[in-house]
Amino acid sequence: MRYLVKSAFQSKFDIYLDMANYTKDIFNYTRYESREVRVGKIGIGGNNPIRIQSMTTTDTMDTMATVEQSIRMIEAGCELVRITAPSIKEARNLENIKAELLKRGYDTPLVADIHYTPKAAELAATLIEKVRVNPGNYADKKRFEEIEYTEETYLSELDRIRERFSPLVNICKEHGTAMRIGTNHGSLSDRILSRFGDTPLGMVESALEFVRICEDLDYHQIILSMKASNPKIMIEAYRLLVVKMQEEGMNYPLHLGVTEAGEGEDGRIKSAVGIGTLLEDGLGDTVRVSLTEEPEFEMPVAIKLVDRYKNRSGHKKIEAVEPNPIDPFEYNVFRSASVLNIGGTNVPRVISDYSHRDAIFQCSLINIGYVYKEELDKWNIKDNASDYIYLGKNKLDFDIPGTLGVIQDLAHWDENRSNSYPLLNLDEYRTFKRKHLPHFLKIMVDDLNEALYDLLRKDAQCVIVLSTDNAHAMPHMRAAFMRLINSKVNNPVLIFRNYDELKDEECVQLYASTDIGGLLNEGLGQGIWISDKCLNCHSRNSLSFGILQATRTRISKTEYISCPSCGRTLFDLQETTAKVRARTQHLKGLKIGIMGCIVNGPGEMADADYGYVGTGNGVITLYKEKEVVKRNIPSLHAVDELVELIKQYGDWVDPA
């Protein structure tokens, strides 16, 4: 099967791939076979474990503060410490930071983070173990201009890049320094954008241009990354990168990260949707979870994500499915038929599990977005209100909103209650006589067979609740969707995941975001049903809507694209993010970027509706999409000015 991978503007730069083997086996867990790259005392790629890294948030010129923070990170599990070096003076001070760490007994490799300043990179490469460069701004300036290149002028630009980049490569060769070539979706050069657009293909070509220069100079100590704040784009870019590397005989290690993931639950969900999906594919040799929190808080999250794969290869074997109807390089929604308000063109639905509760009262539904006003005898319904409630054997003795469906086990089904539907197991389904009424069928992936497909094709009122007990859950479920699609079974499918064995709330967040988000990102599934014994009903509902928000399949709240703080940051990111969120969190569907400096400014906010960017000490610049609209605003008044800007463009509504 041939896969079309598109550039944004000119079809002549589209490419066709005759293979989609971004992993050796999309059904059974196998790690991507990358070459080993040495970074100081540790190996990355090859047979090495997946490494954990993070980045300091201190001023690089404050040696002791940077050392103390680095130690906290290392003791939390950080195996590579990245430090910003925006100019030569910061690059020079890396030597002092390294010396102090060694004096205290810490030999963890250091990584210099470079933007715009080749001379800083060249100096850093002589002092520490690794440098990171962004091909979008190492040799090019970004003016957001679309430039028409002939083939001759485009090649001459590549010659200019080679001239600018080659000195760093030669220094790295001489000193045994490793390099990460890290593309960011939001900071592609105008040259790349003019040919490929802000596409995964553009991200891949941006990095490979630099890799080809390295290979021409016989330098191979390279690690690659394809970061984006949108997990869909990030996943597609990494998969495409692996295939393109295979075509060119490369197998460099991969560093995984979702850039500007944010804070709290949202940051963890978005990170797991992106990073976790690729780890399921066996991709990834190092990981950073980018949270707008203290950097030492990132390590436990990354470790929980990575540790899930230590023994994954022992899972029950999954049978391959042919043909594969899923395009791994482009998002396509697989539309099912519609039953009730599930499937068809409806947004994915959320089912809340109340089956473990001893009793259910009107006030119990507050946790899933329904607030009863007794004095008015009315229900207020929030944007993140569950669509269905599963009662199991329980009953309700009060009236509920008409928008909330009730699912009960067949033996306890209150068939006289409106909006009440039975949940059947496979044996019950085979003998169920009322298939003209909407009903739910809970099955395991291994229950699927031709006889069941035949029954389902004839049953226009059945919603499938699909579950698995395979340790390699997401690919097992993906294989089931492939079988259903190939067998022309068009019933809507709810993705059911049970995490009763987990005792850690954060693990439930991360695992569910990986398992369910990975499927939604491939256009699979018409709803979410999470069961566990760890989260309360409110947290589980919030997690479900958070996964839908992160996969952009159902928007129920404001989205914040906020970078993790670093030494370039010009204000307190955590405090500022909290202030912006407090004023704007009711603006459903808006995306607001909060960036600590101009490096992570307009580029990384490419996807945002509004931007709040530090451009000097105590000074903020506001953006509408990519355009600067207000400059040099004192930070004391900047949140008020942001609210006024949102009002000016007609996107403001008063809080309820």
Regions found by a protein language model. Give the residues of each.
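Active-site beta->alpha loop and helix N-cap motifs at the rims of alpha/beta catalytic domains
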Residues: 78-209, 352-475
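A structural motif
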Residues: 75-80, 128, 219, 283-284, ...
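Short, acidic/polar
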Residues: 61-72, 116-121, 271-275, 373-379, ...
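Catalytic alpha/beta core domains of metabolic enzymes, predominantly
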Residues: 149-161, 165, 169-170, 192-344, ...
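Short, ordered loop/turn segments at secondary-structure junctions
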Residues: 57, 85-88, 114-117, 133-144, ...
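Beta-strand/loop-dominated core regions that host nucleotide or nucleotide-derived cofactor-binding catalytic loops
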Residues: 402, 617-620, 627-651
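Conserved, mostly hydrophobic/aromatic
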Residues: 52, 113, 181, 224, ...
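N-terminal amphipathic alpha-helix/helix-capping segment at the start of soluble metabolic enzymes
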Residues: 16-54, 169, 173-175, 311-361, ...
